[in-house]
UniProtKB/Swiss-Prot annotation:
Inhibited by acetazolamide. Its main location: membrane. Residues 21-281 form the Alpha-carbonic anhydrase domain. One of its GO terms (molecular function) is zinc ion binding. This is Carbonic anhydrase 4.
Length: 308
């Protein structure tokens, strides 16, 4: 049930023929009978929407934003990966969860998906100081609680998304290769395959780098755009080789006829409005060294000089 809820919330299930116009991305709207981002309905016109541009110097330090605790991220499994018509989506097991990081509860992972472009500077949904990245990966988690399902669904923190910007790097990212290799088997919507065994840590930067992040309250970036998401946008990017990034737009299609490559599956930036963006103490800045740390080596040098 948790996985089904997450799929429905993210618009991963496609309508049957004859139903009302379905939502799509801007690149599709000019070629197909579908609703582009400016016509998305439901909660998509509200005031606490995502994604946003994060101005790093304006983000407020929140000392409660400490380290995350990752459970099950090291599990190596052969996972189901699907072309859902909007993105590539990897289903995650019930044993994967996060806590800490200023979150109000434990959150269980349901799936991960990505957004991208053929252009290496416009494939991410969020931007940092106006700069966008080649891709963005979202790991979606649902709040674990003893209350009723309706109460969870209606709360403004029922979903926690970990967002990772993806940049082009000089070397192949071997941890990502099982997913990249699987793309050839899911080129058209509705197809799925099983990836070679891998863990979530294979996809991510080192855990030590995940102390630096930004936090705000927002929405899903696809219809129904529910304003129920605790967003965490990490400062440290994932790095893939350019060829790995371009595999997503060359191997995947929006349509059964393979006429439109899947690319630019990115919602335009939304207004921040009266919301605040917070950052962990280290995000966007170098932490000053404590005074004793500076004094000890200085005094040692002075003493060494006197004893010569």
């Amino acid at each position: 049930m948790q996985l089904l809820f997450a799929l429905l919330a993210l618009g991963a299930l496609r309508p049957l023929a004859g139903e009302e116009l379905h939502w799509c991305y801007e690149i599709q709207a000019s070629n197909y009978s579908c609703l582009g981002p400016d016509k998305w309905q439901e909660d998509c016109q509200k005031s606490r929407q995502s994604p946003i541009n994060i101005v790093t110097t304006k983000a407020e330090v929140d000392h409660s934003l400490g380290r995350f605790h990752f459970s099950g991220y090291d599990q190596r499994e052969a996972r189901l990966v699907e072309n859902n018509g909007h993105s590539v989506m990897v289903s995650l097991g019930d044993e994967i969860s996060i806590s800490g990081g200023g979150l109000p509860a434990r959150y269980r992972a349901t799936q991960l998906h990505l957004h991208w472009s053929q252009e290496l500077d416009r494939g991410s949904e969020h931007s940092l100081d106006g700069e966008r990245s080649a891709m963005e990966m979202h790991i979606v988690h649902q709040k674990e609680t003893g209350t009723s399902g309706n109460e969870v669904q209606d709360s403004d923190d029922s979903i926690a998304v970990l967002a990772f910007l993806v940049e082009a790097g000089p070397t192949m990212n071997e941890g990502f290769q099982p997913l990249v290799t699987a793309l050839s088997a899911i080129s058209i919507p509705g197809t799925n395959t099983t990836m070679a065994p891998s863990s979530l840590w294979d996809l991510l930067p080192a855990e030590e780098e995940l102390r630096h992040y930004f936090r705000y309250m927002g929405s899903l970036t696809t219809p129904a755009c529910s304003e129920t998401v605790v967003w965490t946008v990490f400062q440290e990017p994932i790095r893939l080789h350019r060829d790995q990034i371009l595999e997503f737009s060359s191997k995947l299609y929006y349509d059964q006829e393979r006429k439109m490559n899947m690319k630019d599956n990115v919602r335009p930036l939304q207004r921040l409005g009266d919301r605040s963006v917070f950052k962990s103490q280290a995000a966007g800045q170098l932490l000053p060294l404590p005074l004793p740390t500076l004094l000890v080596p200085t005094l040692a040098c002075v003493m060494a000089g006197l004893l010569r």
